[in-house]
């Protein structure tokens, strides 16, 4: 399912924490990792100066050496590798290389400070989510700063074991569900399917209509569970009332989900944020890894 993955790195402590998780993806079917480093245009502005060209060559050589060491470490763990250094806008280059290499998934990291503080998502990762037609796995880890040192605590074990799939039953949400149905091959043992009745909408409905919506939506959830059973995936269903992102994060914690898999719709995350920001808030606030699957809206 995720045989070929792309791992972009800037060699930071945060990227190294995600790198340490890559061998665990072998249980999800990963066999090959394409290691990518992007020299950002802001790092070495190109011009006609020989000095700039020389600086670019030195930076590229250094990155190639780091990638070579990383590749040897992965090969020692039984993964095949390839490496590449490119120059340009990091997010756009990551998406371009992912398409050229025909990878099945992009793996990146988000950083946080503690279980009680917001997970911070870097601009590059956010832009990749906005641009990539390929599924993106955002790994999560906690950052501890002590005595001037940065330590990243891994939280990536058994990533695909118990998957939470929030759905609004839309055509777009089918994009993620179609991936979820295939996750048994990635080691998934259970799927939790969640639908949240948005309190901002439902508070304007009469009680009898709310009861009708609950009955209809529970029937939809049970149908999805039966669909998953055809793929030999046990499933439990939850119907909640409240703010969708808040309920999703709460269920993820209560049920000890190891991954949240959901769709991002539209042509940009800005569009999604304007209609409620459920996806954006889950990605930013979740302490669990997030698998984002893009759905292009039809026009």
List each model region and its residues:
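Gly/Ser-rich helix-loop-strand patches that form or flank binding pockets
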Residues: 1-4, 24-28, 96-150, 250-299
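Small/aliphatic-rich secondary-structure junction motif
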Residues: 1-52, 156-207, 211, 227, ...
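Charged docking surfaces used in two-component/phosphorelay signaling
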Residues: 85-94, 239-247
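A short helix-to-beta-strand connector/capping loop
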Residues: 74-81, 230-236
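A short acidic, glycine-rich active-site loop
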Residues: 53-65, 209-219
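Well-ordered alpha-helical segments embedded in enzymatic catalytic cores
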Residues: 18, 66, 93, 176-179, ...
């Amino acid at each position: 399912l995720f045989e070929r993955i792309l791992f972009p790195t800037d060699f930071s402590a945060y990227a190294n924490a995600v790198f340490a998780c890559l061998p665990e993806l072998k249980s999800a079917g990963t066999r090959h990792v394409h290691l990518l480093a992007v020299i950002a245009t802001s790092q070495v502005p190109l011009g006609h100066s020989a000095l700039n060209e020389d600086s670019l060559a030195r930076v590229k050589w250094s990155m190639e050496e780091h990638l070579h060491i990383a590749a040897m470490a992965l090969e020692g763990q039984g993964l095949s590798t390839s490496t590449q250094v490119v120059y340009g806008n990091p997010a756009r280059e990551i998406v371009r290389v992912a398409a050229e290499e025909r990878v099945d998934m992009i793996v990146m990291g988000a950083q946080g400070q503690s279980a009680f503080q917001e997970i911070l998502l870097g601009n590059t990762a956010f832009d990749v989510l906005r641009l990539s037609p390929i599924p993106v796995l955002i790994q999560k880890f906690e950052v501890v700063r002590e005595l001037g040192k940065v330590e990243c605590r891994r939280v990536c074990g058994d990533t695909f074991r118990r998957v939470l799939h929030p759905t609004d039953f839309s055509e777009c949400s089918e994009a993620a569900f179609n991936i979820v149905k295939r996750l048994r091959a990635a080691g998934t043992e259970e799927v939790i399917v969640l639908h949240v009745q948005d309190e901002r909408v439902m508070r304007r409905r009469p009680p009898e209509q709310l009861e009708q919506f609950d009955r209809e939506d529970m029937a939809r959830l049970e149908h999805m569970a039966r669909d998953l059973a055809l793929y030999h995936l046990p499933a439990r269903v939850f119907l909640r009332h409240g703010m969708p992102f808040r309920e999703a994060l709460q269920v993820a914690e209560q049920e000890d989900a190891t991954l949240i898999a959901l769709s991002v719709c539209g042509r940009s995350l800005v569009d999604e944020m304007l209609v409620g920001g459920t996806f954006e808030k889950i990605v930013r606030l979740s302490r669990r890894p997030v698998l984002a699957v893009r759905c292009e809206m039809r026009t």
